[in-house]
Curated annotation (Swiss-Prot):
Function: May play a role in DNA repair. It seems to be involved in an RecBC-independent recombinational process of DNA repair. It may act with RecF and RecO.
Protein name: Recombination protein RecR
Recorded name of the encoding gene: recR
Highest classification ranks of the organism: Bacteria, Pseudomonadati, Pseudomonadota, Alphaproteobacteria, Hyphomicrobiales
Family membership: Belongs to the RecR family.
Zinc fingers (C4-type), renumbered ranges: 60-75
PANTHER family given in the database record: RECOMBINATION PROTEIN RECR
Toprim domain boundaries: 83-178
Entry superkingdom: Bacteria
Keyword Mitochondrion among record annotations: no
InterPro entries registered for this protein in UniProt: DNA_Rcmb_RecR, Rcmb_RecR, Rcmb_RecR_Znf, TOPRIM_dom, TOPRIM_RecR
Gene3D superfamilies named in the record: 3.40.1360.10, 6.10.250.240, RecR Domain 1
Amino acid sequence: MAAAVAGPEIERLIQLLAKLPGLGPRSARRAALHLIKKREALMAPLASALQVAIERIQVCKVCGNIDTQNPCTVCTDPRRDPSIIVVVADVADLWALERAHAASGRYHVLGATLSPLDGVGPDDLSIDALVARAHDPQVSEIVLALNATVDGQTTAHYITDLLMEAGVKVTRLAHGVPVGGELDYLDEGTLSAAMRQRTLF
């Protein structure tokens, strides 16, 4: 029987860190050691930030974003265009669009995409709330900012069908050549989409 490498408290820390995305047991062990070595500079502030997150962070009742206020700062920002709702699968996608300063409207977070293989159906997503928001007279466009995967496209088609009676314009993000991309390295699907969605120069 192998001897314990660390005490139970440290092993518990390692096990919890290993549950984070992208951290396996070995990476979690290294992260735990780093935190312990930097106890005052890193571990204590991290513990404090986690406690604040537990106490204050909540899900926005309007769009599904996470924030310390409810409704969130995006929903209450008067500079946002209330006529546009940008639909994303999860909060990470919302953050990506915000970092790029790519969206001027408000958001709606579905929580995931439809994925029959993973057991994710329409009832698991925030689709009913989106349809209700689309019927607001202020709303004129729904932008489907979903991944260009099979699940993302399936979700986009499903939502588009539901929004037909709302009388809003439904658009989706363009797919094509990335900035700095070389054609020789792109897959056929991306090249085909880029050709179909070409614009005037």
